[in-house]
Amino acid sequence: MLFVAACGNGGGSLFNDSIDDYISNNYSLYDTISSTENSDEYARVYLAEDRDISAVSSELQDHEEPTEMSELREGKQVFIYDNQFVTLTESEDNSSDTMIEVAEEEFVRNNYSPGFFQGYLLASVLGNMFGNNWGSQRNQACAANPERCYGGYNSAGTYVGKNSIPTIRGASTVRGGGTGSGK
């Protein structure tokens, strides 16, 4: 397992946006993923066009050091900020783009497959956050109901929380149209 502990200030000054605000202000919202457990929980997926994972990783770390951070491996890197998980993956549509998934801790606890983090974060980090039995309990839940176990945005599978009609993507790329056009 590869693991790097980030040493930093754990958050910026009073004048810095939270990492969630920084991401939403600097990248395009691409899609949302609904929780299978609680309709108030969801993950947001952003698109960093023409920026590879290393560039986006540097931008995020320059804004705020994560409390935990994996190494970049096989087109994926995971950060933990306070109560949020940020996952960077290479876009399946364009290898020069990066997908940025932001999920609250509770969304991760209740929806993610433990295997999603295998090789990226130590089990002890997740155990400290979610309880020592989280991995085995989620594995059992995933075995019983695989469609209720989320494997990340670019994963194949039948997770029921994935929006069959994406909330953002699929919209026209043509902007404008004047008053009353609905854009």
Predicted segments — roles?
Residues F3-A6:
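C-terminal motif of bacterial Sec signal peptides marking the signal peptidase cleavage site
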Residues G8-K183:
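Low-complexity, glycine/proline/serine-enriched intrinsically disordered segments
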